[in-house]
């Protein structure tokens, strides 16, 4: 499960660009800005108030344990994606993290693996497609999920299809866990979204550029090749 969910909930709208300013990576900008405004409304009226109430109700230490639990579950398919990308040592590291945190860390509530020197990675199927040479395609804003690309959208579908939480039964428990994940993640991003509101003149453009730059960096593990200039 990817934090793209959280990024989507932080989406805030901006004014439309002129044709001269149109970014070639974003040919669907008109459509995207419409979805962006929808996400902004959902965030302002539902997601953000719920997250604020949640943060007031639970101490930061408890919220941290909740985040650790979900991060531990994610390590399973982070490892799978590292294997698919040919990074065998990192994949073994990820599965070792899951094993140690699930046992000695009490189902992942405590991140003992990091204390043991096992690094936390960030991988998903969208990054795997990128490593395989699949082009990103146009930038997209997805309803509720936020920033993506055609490639990452396909990756997101696989991320959720294979997410371990989808196998949890009964369905009521599964839905409760998904809801807890979303609210806890949004609560962690409240301060970041406030900074975005204060810093960016056109928040849509700021978020788009930051997202595309970050995804490119993640695909190449922080060392992307120099982009060719037209």
Predicted segments — roles?
Residues 1-4:
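Bacterial N-terminal signal peptides that target proteins for export
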Residues 11-14:
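C-terminal motif of bacterial Sec signal peptides marking the signal peptidase cleavage site
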Residues 19-22, 127, 132-230:
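A structured, mid-to-C-terminal "fold-capping" secondary-structure block
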Residues 23-46:
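Post-signal peptide N-terminal segment of mature Sec-exported envelope proteins
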Residues 45, 50-61:
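Membrane interface segments of multi-pass transport proteins and intramembrane proteases
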Residues 64:
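A small/polar active-site loop signature that marks catalytic segments
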Residues 67-69:
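Beta-rich strand-turn-strand
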Residues 72-150:
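Mid-length scaffold segments of soluble, non-membrane domains
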């Amino acid at each position: 499960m990817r934090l793209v969910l959280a990024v989507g909930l932080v989406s805030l709208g901006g004014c439309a660009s002129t044709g001269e300013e149109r970014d070639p990576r974003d040919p669907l900008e008109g459509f995207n800005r419409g979805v962006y405004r929808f996400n902004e409304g959902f965030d302002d009226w539902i997601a953000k108030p719920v997250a604020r109430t949640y943060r007031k109700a639970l101490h930061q230490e408890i919220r941290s344990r909740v985040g650790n639990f979900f991060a531990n579950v994610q390590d399973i398919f982070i490892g799978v994606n590292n294997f698919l990308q040919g990074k065998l040592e990192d994949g073994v590291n990820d599965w070792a993290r899951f094993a140690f945190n699930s046992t000695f860390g009490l189902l992942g509530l405590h991140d003992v693996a990091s204390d043991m020197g096992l690094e936390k990675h960030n991988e998903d199927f969208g990054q795997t497609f990128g490593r395989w040479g699949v082009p990103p395609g146009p930038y997209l804003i997805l309803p509720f999920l936020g920033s993506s690309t055609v490639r990452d959208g396909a990756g997101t579908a696989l991320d959720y299809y294979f997410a371990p939480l989808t196998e949890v039964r009964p369905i009521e428990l599964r839905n409760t866990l998904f809801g807890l994940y979303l609210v806890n993640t949004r609560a962690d991003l409240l301060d970041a979204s406030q900074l975005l509101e204060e810093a960016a003149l056109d928040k849509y453009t700021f978020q788009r550029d930051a997202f595309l730059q970050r995804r490119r960096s993640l695909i190449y593990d922080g060392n992307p090749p120099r982009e060719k200039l037209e």
